[in-house]
A protein has these predicted regions:
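Feature primarily recognizes SF3-like P-loop helicase cores of small DNA viruses
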Residues: 1-227
Length: 227
């Protein structure tokens, strides 16, 4: 499965919170294991036949950073659950068997589109709170920039943390993080702000609560609101 770091904070569709630490996790991995870094802001990301050019045979992780709202997760299905084919510039091509193919971490400010078991069975979702944000950064608490300004003691603490994580994984396996906030965020993105705004207003009166409402009346009311 792909691990997907998302903002847990509820916000309007299209609004990008960011600065919560999602990419910081990917940067940590870049510092400890062979990682292929891929910027996710490109709208034509998967039209590039050399998109996996930086993946080598010893690559352990592919970090796709800051993907767009319309990110095509389905494109990654074969890579997540099967062999990984890589086209290199210059004509060379290799296929990494599933057992040796890299894992995947995706950082995004938006909910990943798509539903059904084909999507959920290929995702581990992580919700990041807004404890860290534009005005409160890790450097404010720790006094140094992560990784580049760490001393031996900081790295030693990090390796101990990673060892504890491995120990917990070997003891309990993968523990799925609570996903209620992420599901709400995904539903909000699929519905759109106009529908949410209309529903909040339409159902604020008691005359529209706990009664049967003809579907056409609801549709007409929404169309009038949207105009």
């Amino acid at each position: 499965r792909a691990v997907i770091g998302m903002d847990g904070k509820q916000s309007e569709v299209g609004e990008s919170n960011g600065r919560s630490g999602k990419s910081l996790v990917g940067e940590l991995m870049r510092n400890i294991i062979p990682t292929a870094y891929i910027p996710g802001k490109r709208s034509d990301l998967f039209n590039d036949q050399f998109v996996w050019n930086d993946i080598q045979e010893n690559t352990k992780l592919v970090f796709i950073d800051d993907v767009l709202q319309n990110f095509n997760f389905e494109f990654l299905f074969p890579n997540i659950t099967g062999d990984w084919s890589v086209n290199y510039k210059g004509g060379r091509r290799i296929t990494l068997p599933f057992a040796r193919s890299p894992k995947m971490y995706i950082a995004t400010n938006h909910a990943i589109r798509g539903s059904g078991s084909s999507y959920t069975d290929r995702q581990w979702l992580l919700a990041f709170s807004d404890f860290y944000n534009d005005t409160h950064k890790p450097v404010d608490d720790f006094g140094v920039l992560f990784f580049s300004e760490w001393d031996f003691e900081q790295w030693n603490l990090t390796w101990n943390l990673l060892a504890n994580c491995v120990q917990l994984y070997l003891t309990y396996g993968v523990v799925q993080a609570p996903g209620e906030r992420l599901e709400q965020r995904k539903l909000r993105q699929e519905m759109g702000e106009t529908l949410i705004s209309w529903a909040d207003e339409y159902f604020s009166g008691e005359e529209h609560l706990n009664v049967r409402l003809p579907r056409k009346d609801l549709y007409d009311a929404f169309c009038q609101y949207d105009n």
